[in-house]
Amino acid sequence: METQALQKVEQYALKKQNIFASSKIRYVLRSILASIFIGFGITAASKTGSYFFMADSPFAFPAAAVTFGAAILMIAYGGGDLFTGNTFYFTYTALRKKISWRDTLYLWMSSYAGNLIGAILFAILISATGLFEEPSVHSFLIHLAEHKMEPPASELFFRGMLCNWLVCLAFFIPMSLKGEGAKLFTMMLFVFCFFISGFEHSIANMCTFAISLLIEHPDTVTLMGAVRNLIPVTLGNLTAGIVMMGWMYYTLNPDQ
């Protein structure tokens, strides 16, 4: 059933490895680009959500979830390299013995580092615009950041796990579809599902925290709070990519 899609997963992983082998700088730049794209999505989502949030409307999160979907389209079609998707791509390809686990670890670390750099860079750029100076504009973003720093590590881990399961599927399922319209709709639908569900995405959180920390924020939004969130969320994202996606589809397709 997933044969052709899994072949594409393997091809993408090997293509990424080739980019890394030929130029580590180019690979990291693609990772930086991915989190910048997510930064655009976070900006659009938080500003859209703020209009409803300030009016105490229940549509704040649904509106933000819809607009955030633009981020995955920019990554998929704009050449970004996202750590969370790579957890699936490289795990599956490594299990197929087409790439070494050592290279897999290097690729994961490089994409994660690039994503972090991109998140910080975008936060610096967006804070320089002054667009988040007014509380009426940044209140929803701060609310998101505060809310993400509150749960215990165990809950954040499982929210991260379920999130990346959906995100990996958002990249994987469209590989079996025909027509760009169907692919675009599917990707945005899956991203809407993870956002509206309250799941945690490590790279999206990087962007949320980076922007929140650079603009006027309350004492409840701290760098340590961001770190305490990102560690379990990243581990949860990694677990989903390795086990729920990479290992699962390798096991379901032993003759692939």
UniProtKB/Swiss-Prot annotation:
One of its GO terms (biological process) is formate transport. Keywords: Cell membrane, Membrane, Transmembrane, Transmembrane helix, Transport. One of its GO terms (molecular function) is formate transmembrane transporter activity. PROSITE patterns: FORMATE_NITRITE_TP_1 (PS01005), FORMATE_NITRITE_TP_2 (PS01006). Pfam families: Form_Nir_trans. It is found in: Cell membrane. It is a multi-pass membrane protein. PANTHER family: FORMATE TRANSPORTER-RELATED, NITRITE TRANSPORTER NIRC. This is Uncharacterized transporter YwcJ. The gene is ywcJ.
